[in-house]
Amino acid sequence: MLAVRIYNTLTRKKEEFKPLVPGQISMYVCGPTVYNYIHIGNARSSIAFDTIRRYFEYKGYQVKYVSNFTDVDDKMINEARAEKITVPELAEKFINAFLEDTTALNIEPATLHPRATHEIKDIINFVKVLIDKGYAYEVDGDVYYRAKKFQHYGELSDQNIEQLEEGASEHINDEEQNRKEDPIDFALWKAQKGPDEIAWDSPWGKGRPGWHIECSVMSTKYLGNTIDIHGGGQDLEFPHHENEIAQSEAKTDQKFVNYWMHNGFVTVGKDQEKMSKSLHNFVTVHDILRKIDPQVLRFFMASVQYRRQINYSEENLKQAATILDRFKNTLTNINYRIADDTPTKTSEDLVKAINETEEKFVAAMDDDFNVQNALTSIYDLLPVVNANANSDNVDKDALKLFEEKLAAWLLVFGVDIKKLCAQTTGSNDEEIEELVSKRDEARNNKDWATSDQIRDQLKEMGITIQDTPQGTRWTRD
C-alpha cells in the first residue's frame, strides 16, 4: 500500500502518514454547535473530511470516525431563549436538521456522534485531574486553565506567549482580568449565571463545561489518548485546537494528535469574503438544497483540495453540474454499447489507459488529497472511453471495467453513479424516448422535415441526439 502524505498543521509540512495501528485510522473532526441550520461554510468541513475518510476506505483502511455535537454553550442558551424552548429541545431540532442535510449530501454517518451534554461526568473528572496536576484553578465557581504552565502552548498556531498575551489583553474585560491569573487562561467550567440557565452539579457549584474541554474529553474517551488525525476548519486552529492540545496532553502526558488537518474557508462575492453567520453573508444547506441537486453541491465542494478556499457562486455550481453531466453522458453512452448486439473485441490500449488513470488518481490523492489532479486524470480518460464505445471495435469488458473503476473513484467524492444516472432533471426519460422513436420513424419514412423538427425540439429540451450504426442515442446537455 502506497503511503499517503498529509500536510500537518503542527509541523507545517507534508509528512508520510503512519497510523498508530496498521490498517486502522482514528479520526476526530469537530462538529457543529447545533443552534441553527448549518451553512455552506460549515458543510465544507464535513464534506472535506468525509472525502478524506472515503479515500482512506478506498485504500482499504478501517476508519473510526468521531464527530461531536456541541449542544450547550452561550449561543445555544441565547437562541433557546429567543425561541422560548429549552436548550435540549433546540439541540434536538438542529441535530436532526444536520443529519438530514448531511444525508442529502451523501456524507457517511460518523462511527460515533457524541454530545457534550451526555459526557458531563467525564468532563468533570477531566477538569478535576487538571486541577490536581496544577494546570487549572477555580475562581467563584469558574475553572480556568493555566495556559503558560503548558510549555508547548502556541505551537499549533505558531504564536509565542508574548503575542498571545498581547492579543488576549485587548479582548478581556475588567471582570475577567481580575478573575484570571493571566489573560490567556481559558475557561474549563463556567459557573451558572442565573437560576434559569442550564447547569449541572459539580465540585465547584452548578455550571456547565467550556467549549474546548468538551472535544478533549470526547476525542480521548472514544479514540484513546493519542489520535491519528484531528480535523476541523482553519478558524478552529486557534484557540480551540490549541486549547485541546494543552488540556489533553496535560492530563495524559501523551501526544494528543499525530496529524492536524485544517480545511479552508468558503468565500462569497467578488471580494471573496469569508462566509460566516456573524457577517450575515451565509447560505444554509437547508435552503440551498431546495434549489439545486445535492450531488451538484457535494461534488462542487469535494472537487477543491481541502486546504484551499472555495468561492461559492452560481457560476461555479453550474461548472460542477456540467462536469457531472459529462460523467453521466459517458456512462449512458457505454451502457448503450454494452447492451447492444455488437460483438466485443479486446482493446489493450483502453485497458492500459484505465489502469494508468487509476495510478494517476491514487498518486494525486496520496499527495495530501490533491483532488484537482485526481479528477483531471479521470476527465482525460473520458474521450478515450467514448471513442472506444463509438467505434466498431468496442471492448465491452473494458467498458465494464471503466464503469466499475469510475464508480469507485466518484464515490470518494460522494457521488453515487447509480443516483447520478437515475436523475431525471427536466423532461423524463419516457417522454424523450417517445420523441426519439417518432424521429426514428420519420427518418425511416424519409420525412426529413419532421425528423429535423423533432431534433430541434429535443435540443431545446437540453437533449443531444447522436445517430450511430447501432441506432439513435441521446444524452442530456
From Swiss-Prot:
| Residue interval(s) of motif 'HIGH' region | 32-42
The domain of life is Bacteria
Q: Where in the cell is it found?
A: Cytoplasm
UniProt cofactor note: Binds 1 zinc ion per subunit.
User: Which annotated residues bind ATP?
Assistant: 277
Report motif location: 'KMSKS' region. 274-278
Q: Which GO terms describe its cellular component?
A: cytosol
| Cofactor(s), names only, from the UniProt record | Zn(2+)
Q: Which SUPFAM superfamilies match?
A: Anticodon-binding domain of a subclass of class I aminoacyl-tRNA synthetases, Nucleotidylyl transferase
Keywords tagged on the record:
Aminoacyl-tRNA synthetase, ATP-binding, Cytoplasm, Ligase, Metal-binding, Nucleotide-binding, Protein biosynthesis, Zinc
Q: Tell me the subunit arrangement.
A: Monomer.
What protein does this entry describe? Cysteine--tRNA ligase
Protein source organism: Lactobacillus acidophilus (strain ATCC 700396 / NCK56 / N2 / NCFM)
What gene is this protein a product of? cysS
